[in-house]
C-alpha cells in the first residue's frame, strides 16, 4: 500500500491520474542560483515585466552572479541603471537587446550609441505577438504595424554602431517582406522563441500553474510559453488543487522550474498619487508653458464621446483624462494590460503591481479587467479601441507622425505607438505648435523616422486645430489673438481654411 504522503496513481486505459499530494514537485528549486546555474554563454533569454512591474528581480540578480555573458535578451524594457535588467547591462553580460521601449535606462542608451551593445527595437504589440506566435508554433505572421517605417518595413535602422566613435553603422535592420490583403499593405514579422524565460508570478502550485497579480501580468504569460525552459519566480507556492482550474492564468505545461523569491523590492518607477485639494493651485498663476499645455489638454478632452474605449499616450495625452466633459463616460485602455483605468491612488494606497503604460501608479474601477500584453495588443490591433491620443515631435501635411526617436542622440523606442497608429482607431496628436527654438513641428514632410504613415486624423496645438482630410490639412480652429496668417507663419505644411473656422474650443472646468 502506498504511503499517504505520496501521490496515489490510478491506471485506467493507459491514462494516469494523480490525486492530491503533499510531496515536493520536481519543478521546485531551492533558490534562484540553483534555477539559473546551467544557463550557458550566448543564451537567448526572454525576460518578463513592464518597466519594473512584474520583473523577476531575484532571477536577474542570480544571472548576474553567474557571470554568464554574450546574452541575447528579449524584454519589453531594459530596466533602470541599477535595477532590473540594468544590472546585466552594467556588468556587460548582454550582447543584444530586443526591446520596445528603453527610455528609462541611460546605461542602455550610452552603450548602444557607443557601439557597445546591439539593439533590435520592435513595436510593443509586434513584440507581444511575436512571442505569442513563438509559443504557439507559428513561425511568422502579417501585421500592418510599422508599414512605411524604417524600423519595420523599409529596414536600415541601426542595430549596432561602430565602437570607434565614428557613428558608422555596422549592423542594420532587415526590410520586411510585404503583402497586400484587401488593398492594404502588411509586413511579415517572424516569431520569437528563447532558450530560457525568466518570469515573475504572484502564486504557483506544485504543478507549475501560475496566477499573476494586477498589471504585473503584462509580458510574463507570452514569455512563459515561448521558451524551451521557463523559470518562474513567485511570491507563494501552494499545493496542487489550491488554485482552482478556472483561476489559472498560465498552465503548468509551460513551466519547468519554480523558485520562491526570498524577498521582493518591487521598486516603483513613477509613484504618482492624488494631490490634496487645498485651493492653492487654483489661486496660483500658471507659467506660460503650463498654460500652453493646459490649453492643449482641455481641447483634447473634447475628443471624448460617451461610451468610447480610449488609449492615451504618455505625458500630455494622459492629462486629458483629468478634463473629461460632464456627462461623458469613457473607459481607458492601457497597453500593459488594463481596461478600465481609474485615477491615481491616494498616498499610502499605491500598489507596485498596478501601473499604467507610463509606469505611474493607478487604480482600477468597478468593471475593470486585467490581461496580458498579448491580449492588450490584440484589442488594439483588432480595432476595438475607438480613440488614441498621442504626443508628437513632427506631423506632416498628409498625416504622417514621428514621435519616438532622434537618430544619434535620443533613443527611447517606439513603445506601443506604432501599433496604435496602425490599428484603425481615430488618432489625435497633441503637441506644441513649434519647437523650443521656434521651428515648425507641422511640416511638409517629417524629417525624423516615422511612427506611422498617413495615420493622423486630427492635430491639436496651443494655437490651432487641424483635420487631415484626404491627405491634406484643413484648419478648423484658431486660438483667440492669432490670425490665419499667424498660423501660416508657424506652419511649414500647406493647409486650407475651413468655411466654418471657429475659435479654439476648451472644455469647461
Swiss-Prot record:
Localization per record: Mitochondrion
InterPro entries: 3-oxoacid_CoA-transf_A, 3-oxoacid_CoA-transf_B, 3-oxoacid_CoA-transferase, CoA_trans_fam_I, CoA_transf_AS, CoA_transf_BS, NagB/RpiA_transferase-like
Keyword presence, Nucleotide-binding: no
Pfam family, one: CoA_trans
Record's keyword annotation contains Transferase: yes
Gene Ontology CC, one term: mitochondrion
UniProt-listed Enzyme Commission number(s): 2.8.3.5
Cited SMART domains: CoA_trans (SM00882)
Annotated metabolic or biological route of this protein: Ketone metabolism; succinyl-CoA degradation; acetoacetyl-CoA from succinyl-CoA: step 1/1
GO biological process: ketone body catabolic process; ketone body metabolic process
Catalytic residues of the enzyme: 335 (5-glutamyl coenzyme a thioester intermediate)
Enzyme's top EC category: transferase
One GO MF term attached to the UniProt entry: succinyl-CoA:3-oxo-acid CoA-transferase activity
UniProt keyword list: Mitochondrion, Transferase, Transit peptide
Catalyses which reaction(s): a 3-oxo acid + succinyl-CoA = a 3-oxoacyl-CoA + succinate
Main location: mitochondrion
Function: Key enzyme for ketone body catabolism. Transfers the CoA moiety from succinate to acetoacetate. Formation of the enzyme-CoA intermediate proceeds via an unstable anhydride species formed between the carboxylate groups of the enzyme and substrate.
Subunit structure: Homodimer.
Entry similarity comment: Belongs to the 3-oxoacid CoA-transferase family.
PANTHER family the UniProt entry points to: KETOACID-COENZYME A TRANSFERASE, SUCCINYL-COA:3-KETOACID-COENZYME A TRANSFERASE
Name by which UniProt lists this protein: Probable succinyl-CoA:3-ketoacid coenzyme A transferase, mitochondrial
Species of provenance: Dictyostelium discoideum
Gene encoding the protein: oxct1
